[in-house]
């Protein structure tokens, strides 16, 4: 097997695990600092910020492991329905694939980078694993310089 074939086989195993065995990616949530918590998994970092106005989530992973995210948030004593803002760091499916489900559950406002918004509004066909990113309502845009 060539090096390229080995890499492709390894990537196939990783993708299978991500989509068909998400429980293998479970990670215990933990406090990072003061009011910031890690609620992601071993593959994708997701952060929860507790504010007086409600919860802010930075990224949300993807549909297949949304239940892990919800379990992590609840495990820290928070209610996922209290998420007010979801900030998507970038347009990869594993950082925003569960956005619509979270929006439906909590009615959170979604923030996305202006440059990434193009792919969600104009060129969804250019999103890798597009079928893993259900359409969602974009409420606000942020600039990379902010």
Where are the language model's segments positioned?
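Accessory terminal helices/loops
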Residues: 1-22
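Residue-level detector of flexible, active-site-proximal loop/helix-junction positions
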Residues: 14, 18, 43-45, 64, ...
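A short, structure-level motif marking secondary-structure boundaries and short turns
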Residues: 12, 53-55, 84, 131
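Conserved beta-strand hairpin/beta-sheet module of binuclear metal-dependent hydrolase folds
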Residues: 22-76, 80
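Active-site HxH/HxHxD metal-binding segment of metal-dependent hydrolases
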Residues: 36, 64-67, 74-146
């Amino acid at each position: 097997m060539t090096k390229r074939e080995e890499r492709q086989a390894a990537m196939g195993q990783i993708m299978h695990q991500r989509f068909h065995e998400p429980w293998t990616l479970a990670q215990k949530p933990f406090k990072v600092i003061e009011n910031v918590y890690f609620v992601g998994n071993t593959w994708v970092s997701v952060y929860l910020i507790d504010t007086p106005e409600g919860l802010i989530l930075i990224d949300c992973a993807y549909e297949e492991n949304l239940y892990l995210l919800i379990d992590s948030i609840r495990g820290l004593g928070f209610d996922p329905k209290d998420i007010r803002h979801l900030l998507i760091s970038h347009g990869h499916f594993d950082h925003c694939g569960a956005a619509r489900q979270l929006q439906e559950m909590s009615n959170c406002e979604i923030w996305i980078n202006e440059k990434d918004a193009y792919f969600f509004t104009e060129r969804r066909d250019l999103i890798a694993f597009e079928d893993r990113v259900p359409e969602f309502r974009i409420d606000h845009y942020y600039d990379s310089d902010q």
